[in-house]
Amino acid sequence: MLTIIDFNFKRSNLLKMFLKIKNIPKVYWSSEKPLNLKPKISTFFFLCLGLTLFGLGEGLLIVSFAGASPWSVLAQGIALNVDFSTGIITIFVSIAVLLLWLPLKQKPGIGTILNAIIIGLMIDVCIKFMPTPENYIYQILLAIIAVLTVGLGGGIYLVANLGAGPRDGLMVGLQKKTNLPIAIVRAFLEITVMSIGWYLGGTVGVGTLLFAFGIGPAVALSLFIVGKFFN
């Protein structure tokens, strides 16, 4: 009985620790600065690994057919009200988010560029080779796996510190300004974006809700694991 109580207590403490993470941990393969054109091989490797996992997760979410990510819902909602495609709107939204970096003093890097390239390629690979589960329960399970995969990849590439993607950079910048836990900042962003997109006519599914409420804790958990494992 004591063993079970001790286990539950330790598990509760670990949960509180990663949910309260406020900073991106530094490990031996982290770059000293985002604008680093000659990173270490290990830094570049983990950057690409993280972005690959991120793109894989995004692709799995689309393939699950359980609902798109909140930012895709926003793009879809805007596209329904203007004469542009969802893809073009996604680019415009990314540019707008990058402009929000200026007051937050966020710095781009090679990771900011590779973010779009690698994630886009992985999404296409998933859509081409990964079948959509016919069973609704399996679709939801795949959506959960997708959110966890995006969180894991996001944590790894953020620790590489070679420049975040537009949305992750916004998350990091807002965290520094507010000093709130990363899990809360990311969840706030995703829920806000999802709500605006839904109001404009975008389609929200179970996968969208899983992403909106789950990606913050998933990224925080990844940062916690990477920080503990490599230190």
Say what each PLM segment does:
Residues 2-231:
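Core subunits and conserved enzymes of cellular information-processing
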